[in-house]
Amino acid sequence: MKALDELTFDNRFARLGDAFSTHVLPEPLDNPRLVAASPGAMALLDLDPAVAETPVFAELFGGHKLWAEAEPRAMVYSGHQFGSYNPQLGDGRGLLLGEVYNQAGEHWDLHLKGAGQTPYSRMGDGRAVLRSSIREFLASEALHALGIPSSRALCVIGSDTPVWREKQERGAMVLRLAPSHVRFGHFEYFYYTKKPEQQKQLGEHVLALHFPECQELPEPYLAMFREIVERNAELIAKWQAYGFCHGVMNTDNMSILGITFDFGPFAFLDDFDAHFICNHSDDQGRYSFSNQVPIGQWNLSALAQALTPFISVEALRESLGLFLPLYQAHYLDLMRRRLGFTQAEDDDQKLVERLLQLMQNSGVDYSLFFRRLGEHAPEQALARLRDDFVDRNGFDAWAELYRERVARDPIQGQDLRRARMHAVNPLYILRNYLAQKAIDAAEAGDYSEVRRLHQVLSRPFEEQPGMDSYAERPPEWGKHLEISCSS
């Protein structure tokens, strides 16, 4: 394990030059202090978890100190926001400190969010508040633990720095890790500003670093785009299967690596609601839960437009046509596993759709239903779940189909069935009300609940003694909370 001063930097994005980013120093927080750190994320940098408790840790990730090898840069990009093109966005409050490579040879971007104003702050103060920083920290690590591709969060640093939003709050910083911070919007920026040389330079950079296997193929850019399509189809399939609503699927928030990026007003479903809108600024429901699949394809089409200098329109259209079949295959595979099936049958999609409609009509808790379905043998589990449904006759009809489907599946024994289902059906998810309780405590100076919640969410599939309250249905006030983009 390494100490903080032993990290090895290799700042490949910074070497692209000033057309891609601007050198900016972090603005330090007043009285920085550790709110929470992720040992799992620290391990990606070979860091000893004990260093999180040292004063220099808070000073580094609170903007007071920098490694000599770090090259803090604010990246420039553009993007489509709620369907409309915004010509220049960029890192308005975050800085790419540099890239660190670990003993396994993996490169990880170190990105400090809430680091102060940059040339791309667009009249903003460049700060992030404590509540949004805690949410990003918890969400990043929770999604990773669920097996959903995501950026990681090394730590949250709190402070006494005053920040004004709807009211005065305290500033904070999050240290985010990702193999790359290149977004769809990076390619859009150089396409729409008509900078073909820089766009080509960006493309070669991304190919060499993140899609090297595509370089050997006859059409490397086309191969790369198809890989991006596949990764995003799989990502969104996992969002839908686990009930995750991102909330702000603008193209500048979409990663070329197909990882969940830029957590804002996200939410996991409580009661199943296909039309749930977690972002209270989304008046039209563009980024509602049910729209995430078509919006994912729309965003890929926006990226495709930016790649027309490298790939024929016909080939791009053909590749975009792969998205929905790929999504459906990944989604159905996940849902079969959540229902306890080990083999595919033609009518599985209808069985899933019928179940979701029944859950929608009755307001059934999405995550708890699947967890409880695997607790007991099908007959007993279905009898216990029946009371959650208003349409008992409809549920009985579905339950009969489910029993018949289970009987045809080759899985043997309830113990094996329970183990397989519990391995894909979490007991603990990051419900918004749990995050809010942790935030309320943290804003009062008590960080223990943030740390406890993080520990619980790091093992979502395992029953943890004494943690029953984290697996309960939310209270009425905690259901379907809409979260502001204000952060």
From Swiss-Prot:
Q: Which Pfam families match?
A: SelO
The GO molecular function terms of this record are: AMPylase activity; ATP binding; magnesium ion binding
User: From the record, what ranges are coiled-coil?
Assistant: none
| Catalytic residue positions | D252
Residues binding ATP: G90, G92, R93, K113, D125, G126, R176, R183, D262
Q: What class of enzyme is it?
A: transferase
Judging by the UniProt lineage, the source's domain of life is: Bacteria
EC number per UniProt: 2.7.7.-, 2.7.7.108
Show the catalytic activity. Answer: L-seryl-[protein] + ATP = 3-O-(5'-adenylyl)-L-seryl-[protein] + diphosphate; L-threonyl-[protein] + ATP = 3-O-(5'-adenylyl)-L-threonyl-[protein] + diphosphate; L-tyrosyl-[protein] + ATP = O-(5'-adenylyl)-L-tyrosyl-[protein] + diphosphate; L-histidyl-[protein] + UTP = N(tele)-(5'-uridylyl)-L-histidyl-[protein] + diphosphate
Give the record's family classification. Belongs to the SELO family.
**Purpose of the protein:** Nucleotidyltransferase involved in the post-translational modification of proteins. It can catalyze the addition of adenosine monophosphate (AMP) or uridine monophosphate (UMP) to a protein, resulting in modifications known as AMPylation and UMPylation.
Name assigned to this protein: Protein nucleotidyltransferase YdiU
Q: Gene encoding this chain?
A: ydiU
